[in-house]
Regions:
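DNA polymerase processivity clamps
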Residues: 1-96, 114-223
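Long, charge-dense
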Residues: 95-115
């Protein structure tokens, strides 16, 4: 089995959410943060032949980079990673899945059953980068998502502890069910670059769906 560039990008992203990783048999991969406040699911091009538990995903990805165009051959307790010529080989042992933090299919199903949303908006990659740069410049960690009415949504970088702090705001296309505001910790926006359809629920959870790739995230809101 070969790993595509798209899948490598997703795996690198998942490594920032949680180093523990289990690739379940099939073509759906998932991850959840240790704090259970970031959950993600993605369909990939490859088909895993069996479950594969990885204790440190970032280390595993670094190992893959040791060979050009790595090819994976699964065994019961390890995977053999080789280059296309077969000259270079790495034997990498799996970790018992019981020792790893990973999401269950039920967690994904429950998150996917969100039916009612208070705010929905489009978040393009350029806007997200502006939000992150503003947070870094101002020294803030929170982003407020606010709908004034049924037409238009405002994202604001601010300090939750200081009402007189400097702020950055940007309008985005979207709508809400009347007036409402919700807060997301910007450090939890560990998502693959791209444009997203975002929905905010009053159940203290947000859903980020990538517009071009089959990947989505559920990110907890700040209470």
């Amino acid at each position: 089995m070969n790993i595509s560039e798209n899948t490598m990008q997703i795996l690198k992203n998942y490594g920032t959410i949680n180093p523990n990783f289990i690739a379940r048999k099939g073509n759906t991969i998932m991850t959840v943060s240790e704090a259970k406040n970031i959950l993600s699911s993605s369909n990939i091009e490859e088909q895993f032949e069996q479950d594969m538990g990885i204790y440190d995903l970032n280390e595993f990805l670094n190992v893959l980079s040791l060979v050009d165009q790595p090819k994976l051959d699964m065994e019961e307790k390890w995977v053999t990673i080789s280059d296309q010529t077969g000259r270079s080989k790495i034997k990498y042992f799996f970790t018992d899945p019981e020792m790893l933090t990973s999401p269950t299919e039920k967690m994904i199903q429950n998150a996917g059953n969100m039916e009612s949303f208070e705010i929905s908006f489009t978040l393009d990659n350029d806007t997200l980068n502006k939000v992150k740069r503003a947070a870094s410049a101002l020294g803030h960690t929170s982003m407020k998502v606010e709908s004034k009415d049924t037409d238009g949504v405002v994202l604001m970088v601010f300090d939750t502890e200081n009402p007189t702090s400097n702020t950055f705001s940007i309008d985005v296309p979207g709508q809400g069910q009347g007036e409402g505001q919700y807060v997301i910790n910007i450090s939890n926006l560990k998502i693959v670059p791209g444009d997203y359809d975002v929905k905010i629920s009053n159940k203290n959870i947000s859903n980020f769906i990538h517009k071009e790739k089959p990947i989505q995230y559920w990110i907890a809101l700040e209470k």
